[in-house]
Amino acid sequence: MKKTDTENQFLIDDIDKQIMALLKDDARASLKSLASYTYLSSTAVSARIEKLEKAGDIQGYYTRINPENFGLSVRAFINLDLEPIQKKDFYPYVRSCPNVVACNCVTGDYSMLLEVLFASTFELDKFINELQHFGKTKTQIVFSTPVEHRDVLPKDRS
């Protein structure tokens, strides 16, 4: 891991990429396991992980939970046409909604794109009615997800 010109920025080498790929597949992998795959000592792997965390390249470690096991089988994407002045009221509202998985500010005909999970279309409909206080909506219900959310590993830092 070589230092670049920017403070706290490091060039990512092939070993760093390998460590990130291994952690992406199993965030609970032990240092010993990572060391055996990378042919480094556990101490060296730990130091690289710490540097990647400090640089912001590794932002956290997550557990993937199956929402269907908890009765949340209706996944939908909701486009919302929100006026810029409404953002100060909308953002706190949407952050407080536990069924909102993601909320993105986007370009195009709508300004916001929400991903939500609900137990039924009835509950989804109630939520959409609440959202319509902020603006016009357009909803797409997901039938299947051939590619689940995944992190993309970097090729190189520019």
Each predicted region: which residue ranges?
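A compositional/biophysical signature of low hydrophobicity enriched in polar/charged and small residues
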Residues: 1-158
